[in-house]
């Protein structure tokens, strides 16, 4: 696919980073990383994926959601965005060294993994429809573009077999070493542990965990204060030291909620504390539509 040149340096760079981490230790990850992730695909008025990447604000954009799977049907909901241009937009983002992930799950109820076989079937579809599998006869909604990784946003249903799905997806790294690697991330609720994702996360195959410190009054800053956030943050970072843990923030106050952290409190109180973690990874914003309205990310970017 396009951006092979971009990926060609990933292997040698990974080797350098691995050596560096052995020499310097995980403490090198503490403090600002400059990494900011945003979710895209939940509102047609947020603009195109290309426009999102052209803002220069984000280092990763997560397409949401691949929301129908597990029962022989596979489909996504991108809120009316034109599928015909998304493939080209993915390549455009990748050409700017912005990673594009596909998030599976979401708020709908049309997904689950009733058996280990269904997990294998879903992994097969994701690999061939959205990544570098490209088996003939498998519909590719984004054409020949391949996403950089898969995000697990399992917010509904039973927790069964998501660990199997993670293992099946990750196994493609051994089967196709010369191709685009399968990178796994998870987006979880802030209260530790997230019961739907615990078994999957315990596989230790997830390089990032985006923890949503919103939508839950027990651990969102505006409701629970710094102590409420840190009580959960410290559990996430301690339990998964091999994963980069991202601070998930609401880019606006959704009607009926008060989860958007005021800029001054974010800068002086929240970020200095979460960035003490050795495996702090960056900031995740929900979502592009709200960020476009408020401009929250334009300020937060420099503190991530």
Curated annotation (Swiss-Prot):
Residues 34-304 form the GH18 domain. Constitutively expressed in shoots. It holds the Pfam family Glyco_hydro_18. Transmembrane segments: none annotated. InterPro entries: Cts1-like, Glyco_hydro18_cat, Glycoside_hydrolase_SF, Glycosyl_Hydrlase18_Chitinase. GO terms for biological process: carbohydrate metabolic process; defense response to fungus. Keywords: Disulfide bond, Plant defense, Secreted, Signal. GO terms for molecular function: enzyme inhibitor activity. It comes from the Eukaryota. Disulfide bonds join 53-93, 190-219. PROSITE patterns: GH18_2. It is found in: Secreted. Binds to fungal GH11 xylanases. Fungal xylanase inhibitor. Possesses competitive inhibiting activity against fungal endo-1,4-beta-D-xylanases belonging to glycoside hydrolase family 11 (GH11). May function in plant defense against secreted fungal pathogen xylanases. Is similar to class III chitinases, but does not exhibit chitinase activity. This is Xylanase inhibitor protein 1. It comes from Oryza sativa subsp. japonica.
């Amino acid at each position: 696919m396009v951006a092979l040149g971009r990926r060609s340096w990933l292997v040698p760079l990974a080797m350098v980073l691995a050596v560096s981490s052995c020499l310097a230790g995980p403490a090198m990850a503490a403090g600002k990383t400059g990494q900011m992730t945003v979710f895209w695909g939940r509102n047609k008025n947020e603009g195109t994926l290309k426009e999102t990447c052209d803002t220069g604000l984000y280092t990763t954009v997560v397409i949401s959601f691949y929301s129908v799977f597990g029962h022989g049907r596979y489909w996504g909901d991108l809120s009316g965005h034109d599928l015909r241009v998304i493939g080209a937009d993915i390549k455009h983002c990748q050409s700017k060294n912005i990673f594009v992930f596909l998030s599976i799950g979401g708020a709908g109820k049309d997904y689950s993994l009733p058996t280990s076989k269904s997990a294998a079937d879903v992994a097969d579809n994701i690999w061939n429809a959205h990544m570098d599998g490209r088996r003939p006869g498998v519909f590719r909604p984004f054409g020949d573009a391949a996403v950089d990784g898969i995000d697990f946003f399992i917010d509904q249903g039973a927790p069964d077999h998501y660990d199997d799905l993670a293992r099946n997806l990750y196994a493609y790294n051994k089967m196709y070493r010369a191709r685009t690697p399968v990178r796994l991330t998870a987006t979880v609720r802030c209260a530790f542990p997230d019961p739907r994702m615990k078994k999957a996360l315990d596989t230790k195959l997830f390089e990032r965990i985006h923890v949503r410190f919103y939508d839950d009054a027990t651990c969102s800053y505006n409701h629970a204060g710094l102590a409420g956030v840190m009580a959960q943050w410290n559990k996430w970072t301690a339990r998964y030291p091999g994963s980069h843990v991202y601070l998930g923030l609401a880019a606006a106050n959704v009607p009926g909620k008060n989860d958007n952290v005021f800029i001054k409190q974010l800068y002086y109180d929240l970020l200095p504390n979460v960035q003490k973690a050795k495996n702090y990874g960056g900031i995740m914003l929900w979502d592009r539509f709200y960020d476009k309205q408020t401009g929250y990310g334009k300020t937060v970017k420099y503190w991530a």
